[in-house]
UniProtKB/Swiss-Prot annotation:
It holds the Pfam family Ribosomal_L27. It comes from Mycobacterium marinum (strain ATCC BAA-535 / M). This is Large ribosomal subunit protein bL27. GO terms for biological process: translation. The keyword Ribonucleoprotein applies. It comes from the Bacteria.
Length: 88
């Protein structure tokens, strides 16, 4: 078999689709239960209060509330807290 394919042909031209990783809901945003908060590879962010972790390390809200980012024991965590109610 030839290792050189000949004129006007190329071995390049392949590219993979982006994985759409990253933070999907930011601090202070109000979310419902089940909403995806972060899509990640590995645990860049760790689950906190009312946050679950899927098999692919995706973090999701287990309850409705506001997103809160924080640090606990040197790890970045995400919590879901009661949204601040405004009395007006």
């Amino acid at each position: 078999m030839a290792h050189k394919k000949g004129a006007s042909s190329s071995r390049n031209g392949r590219d993979s689709a982006a994985q759409r990783l990253g933070v999907k809901r930011f601090g202070g945003q109000v979310v419902k239960a089940g909403e995806i908060l972060v899509r990640q590879r590995g645990t860049k962010f760790h689950p906190g209060v009312n946050v679950g972790r899927g098999g692919d390390d995706t973090l999701f809200a287990k309850a409705a509330g506001a997103v809160q980012f924080g640090i606990k024991r040197g790890r970045k965590t995400i919590n879901i807290v009661e949204p601040a109610t405004q009395d007006a």
